[in-house]
């Protein structure tokens, strides 16, 4: 079904791109650009939906490989620093004990990406912080913001697959993002905790057990 859904969308995008190259004058060019942007958004939504169902059905398995925790933190900082600055927010990044661990790097980055994206999205003043710490075989990743925060009821709904926040300022809600992240954390054998207060911001804490790669694969602390 993945192939059946993606093929026609790929065709629409492809033919529209060809049309854009041949007809790029006046309003026609803008109309075609709008079609391309809408197709891109639809593709992203489709990929997100398919990702959710794969994880929810237990069909996705971790792809473990050695990676340095600070490399994950650096990737997230590089991506979100300009996003925060452009919105007038501060982004604080702190990395505790660094280590080379055996984990699914792309999924860990996806978790951090989702948390930071929501934190920036729902914060209008103040800032966002990212903290990573590795201790006793457990990676702790914390994202905290000074944003709108959530009521107790909204916190209960936050990880639901199709729940939306009722706050008008957050009318786009979390969508499937947090539901997917919850499933990713579960797939990796971890836990996620939400602490929030309306008008005071939110704090997400993810804890995932993982072994140091050097214990199994002979990596040293100087391995890139």
Q: Residue locations for each model-derived region?
A:
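Short alpha-helical segment of the dimerization/phosphotransfer core of two-component systems
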Residues: 37-45
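Short conserved segment of the HATPase_c
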Residues: 150-162
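Short acidic helix/loop segment immediately C-terminal to the autophosphorylated histidine
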Residues: 20-26
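Conserved catalytic submotifs in the C-terminal HATPase_c
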Residues: 63-68, 85, 90-99
